Amino acid sequence: MTTENQDALSEIASAATLADLEAIRVRTLGKSGTITALLKTLGAMTPDQRQAEGPKIHALREAVTAAIADRKASLEGAALEARLATETLDMSLPVSAGMQGSVHPVAQVMDELAEIFADLGFAVATGPEIEDDWHNFTALNIPETHPARAMHDTFYFPDREDGKKMLLRTHTSPVQIRTMMTEKPPIRIIAPGRTYRSDSDATHTPMFHQVEGLVIDRGIHMGHLKWTLETFVKAFFERDDIVLRLRPSFFPFTEPSAEVDVGFTWEKGRRVIGGDPAAGNGGWMEILGSGMVHPRVIANCGLDPDEWQGFAFGCGIDRLAMLKYGMDDLRAFFDGDLRWLRHYGFAALDVPTLSGGVGA
């Protein structure tokens, strides 16, 4: 047994490759191996013989197993050293560019709006996109005969058993209603989000993004509204030469109401917000609607209109993005074209800040 042990260990130590070592393992410890055959003889031995020979055979198997493991580790280590000696890594080579996503212009503009109005003391409020008829129309002083309630302009859901009409909200004004009903004045919020109307062309889509603002407090008047809008538009377009014009208009939920125009100039064939609209290359462009919150709307929310007044405004986020960043077709916003997104998208770390410029 001692001779067999020495021969096996010597053969293992002299194995030059992993393949040679595996052949030795199979020849000694495999199903038909020499040591396996010795283990099988234990069953035919007498108890005295088994007691004398068993420990020797088991010791031989353990010694061979350990020697094979040690030699395998040695050969693998040598192979690794040899491979590393032939491989080099050129640290001066440029790294392959990884795939990067981009922030959609609508999401970027939403962040810009939140940053600007947060500096003015406004909070961001949200609400459900599936609304009931009362929050979307009735509470906002929109009569049953108003065209906005028509099926061709609003997406309605099938009638419910309780008779309540459900629809996809046509504006984010219901967020204002819910806020006035659940929070105590004074209130300063903006309500950005998705809205839905049955319309589709180069400047309209069935789903679009809108932001509305609401201020409720004592002694609020049109001067507060005009200052807020001027401050917002100047910060958003990052120009101090912004000129606004308020034109009398009509909205059921505000009284008085005003359409807000902004002055622009033509530069290289494109309209650029800012500058003197009275100049030969200038003009006016409507960008949002606004007005003092109608007393009936305030009363519908459980507040006393004799004590509380407020103003509201609203505009399309997609339209703001088009005016600021030069997109021509609103439908491209939702086509999912990677070329368009790479061109107009923003880097993930390009976070809007007032100190660095909201459009930086």
Swiss-Prot record:
Q: What is this protein called?
A: Phenylalanine--tRNA ligase alpha subunit
Amino acids binding Mg(2+)? E255
Instruction: Report the co-factor binding details.
Output: Binds 2 magnesium ions per tetramer.
Question: Sorted alphabetically, which keywords does the UniProt record give?
Answer: Aminoacyl-tRNA synthetase, ATP-binding, Cytoplasm, Ligase, Magnesium, Metal-binding, Nucleotide-binding, Protein biosynthesis
Output a single Gene Ontology CC term carried by this record. Answer: cytoplasm
Q: Name one GO biological process term.
A: phenylalanyl-tRNA aminoacylation
Organism of this sequence:
Rhizorhabdus wittichii (strain DSM 6014 / CCUG 31198 / JCM 15750 / NBRC 105917 / EY 4224 / RW1)
The compartments listed are:
Cytoplasm
Q: Name one GO molecular function term.
A: ATP binding
Output the PANTHER family linked to this UniProt entry: PHENYLALANINE--TRNA LIGASE, MITOCHONDRIAL, PHENYLALANYL-TRNA SYNTHETASE
Its needed co-factors are: Mg(2+)
